[in-house]
Amino acid sequence: FSQSKPQGLVPTPSISFAAGAVKPGTALDLACGTGRHTIFLAERGWHVIAVDGSRVGINLMLAEAEARHCRNRIEHYVKDLEAQPAEFVIEPDGYDLIADCFFLHRPLFSAIRFGVRPGGLFVGALHVSAPGLDNRHRFVLKQGQLVGMVRDWGWKILYESKDLDTNRAVEGQSTEALVAQRPA
């Protein structure tokens, strides 16, 4: 991240949907970057735990949150989410919403599954291999893999989006997003 003001603070449609689907509670924003989802949720009354490996990204988020008068609803941690042993632990039944947008680290899925409280939401938006291409990159899922995994958990899919981003399609990627609710 550059040290300038964060750009692109518009949340993904899946986050916008989730914020209106349940009453505000405690949210976990994994790999929050410069905080577009953290700030969006905090402005809507959520208490947000924001985690990212970049101190620069966290600092940009905090400055923007201060300017938007929602800093008091944000806890932040500079932690490597891929570290072994884990630098940040997702507490079981600890969150009303967990967001994982454009950060794929497969070992987190189990912790996400059990970290969402009953009745709570998982918001996932991840890159997937484009039609007809295989999954050669470790940060890309196969098409339908995210939805299939969450359905295997027994969760209800409330929102689903498949987006072929023509800019990313050149790289053989598109995006899939969902909002899923853990059974109460």
What annotation goes with each model-predicted range?
Residues G25-G33:
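Conserved class I S-adenosyl-L-methionine
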Residues E87-L97:
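A short acidic, Gly/Pro-enriched loop at the edge of an enzyme's catalytic core
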Residues F1-V22:
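S-adenosyl-L-methionine
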Residues H47-D52:
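Conserved SAM-binding motif I beta-strand of class I
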Residues S54-V56:
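Conserved SAM/SAH-binding beta-strand->alpha-helix loop
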Residues F109-G120:
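A short glycine-rich, Lys/Arg-flanked "PGG" loop and its adjoining helix->strand segment in the class I
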Residues G120-S129:
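Conserved beta-strand signature within the Rossmann-like core of class I S-adenosyl-L-methionine
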Residues C70-A83:
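Conserved SAM-binding strand-loop segment of SAM-dependent methyltransferases
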